[in-house]
A protein has these predicted regions:
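Noncatalytic scaffold domains of N-terminal-nucleophile
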Residues: 1-14, 18-21, 26-162
Length: 162
């Protein structure tokens, strides 16, 4: 299959390309790359995060969005923290709240959906088994990998707001 794979860390992209070379389709490659990315750069793309996957099925012209955004508790409402907002986060993602309510404590917890969504996308639109897609990530976790400079820096810096 012709194709290309993009990922923040080269090793993840390379594993996605290998998935294509081994006969996998685009979803097999994307899931494989995502799982490897979660191992080699866990602060940016880990299985505890959130996101989405867009799939285009050329044979049917169908566009599909696989949602893996975290779920919150049943008592959460859209205006839950409106009166607690101090301002936008320095990095432009989200907001800083009084008492770090969205970062620390029980109210900050969302149920990650990444594993469920990747597994579901693979079983519905892929051709590989979960075990085949997960194998490269397991291999990288076992043998180790070079830590990117940004990750090493993040691990050394104490928590700061925003």
């Amino acid at each position: 299959m012709n194709g290309m794979v993009a990922a923040p860390q080269p090793v993840a992209a390379e594993e996605g390309v290998l998935a294509l070379r081994r006969g996998g389709n685009a979803v097999d490659a994307a899931v494989t790359a995502a799982l490897v990315q979660g191992v080699v750069d866990p602060l940016n793309c880990g299985i505890g995060g959130l996101g989405g996957m867009q799939i285009y099925r050329a044979e049917s012209g169908e566009g599909i969005f696989v949602d893996f955004f975290s779920s919150v508790g049943a008592q959460a409402t859209p205006d839950l923290w409106v009166d607690q907002i101090l301002g936008p986060a320095v990095d432009g993602v989200g907001f800083i709240l009084r008492g770090d309510l969205n970062e620390i404590g029980y109210q900050s917890i969302g149920t990650p959906a990444t594993v469920r969504a990747l597994s579901g996308a693979l079983s519905r639109y892929g051709t590989w088994s979960w075990e085949e897609a997960l194998a490269p990530a397991i291999a990288w976790a076992r043998k180790g990998y070079p830590i990117p400079a940004e990750l090493a820096r993040d691990w050394r810096v104490p928590y700061a707001e925003g």
